């Protein structure tokens, strides 16, 4: 089994759903490196009795801290249960996190069913590395 670096994020109204999903997959998740934003990380530690690398709370910059880890290829999977029914004070940060995950072709799940697919994929147990898009032309463009 290859140890994955998994980022887990949930908006306040979605934390209960994420924790229920984590309980369902706790035997698998506890063997991986887990990262989370503030209070989500605390709830995960309590649920799994494992150490979680915790960032700041999302509104205090935690989403952006995870985004930096994605750019630096320090995260393998992002599981983000975001609240589709309520605007967040840090919506620009949420959008930035999701955008940067797509920019770097990171597997992302935004709900329990998609997260189930990620964890049960045959690629999950492999040394899978998503293709990194080639941005050299963009980096070298003349403005």
From Swiss-Prot:
**What is the purpose of this protein?**
Catalyzes the formation of methylglyoxal from dihydroxyacetone phosphate.
Name the InterPro entries on file. Methylgl_synth (IPR004363), Methylglyoxal_synth_AS (IPR018148), MGS-like_dom (IPR011607), MGS-like_dom_sf (IPR036914)
NCBIfam families referenced in this protein's UniProt entry, alphabetically: MGSA, PRK05234.1
* Similarity comment text for this entry: Belongs to the methylglyoxal synthase family.
Protein EC: 4.2.3.3
Active site positions, chain numbering: 63 (proton donor/acceptor)
Q: Protein name, please?
A: Methylglyoxal synthase
Q: Which GO terms describe its cellular component?
A: cytosol
Pfam families linked: MGS
**Source organism (scientific name):** Coxiella burnetii (strain RSA 331 / Henzerling II)
Can you name one GO molecular function term for this protein? methylglyoxal synthase activity
Enzyme kind, highest EC tier: lyase
Task: Please list the GO biological process terms of this entry.
Answer: methylglyoxal biosynthetic process
Bilayer-crossing regions: none
Gene that specifies this protein? mgsA
Record's catalysed reaction(s): dihydroxyacetone phosphate = methylglyoxal + phosphate
Recorded hits in Gene3D superfamilies, A to Z, give: Methylglyoxal synthase-like domain (3.40.50.1380)
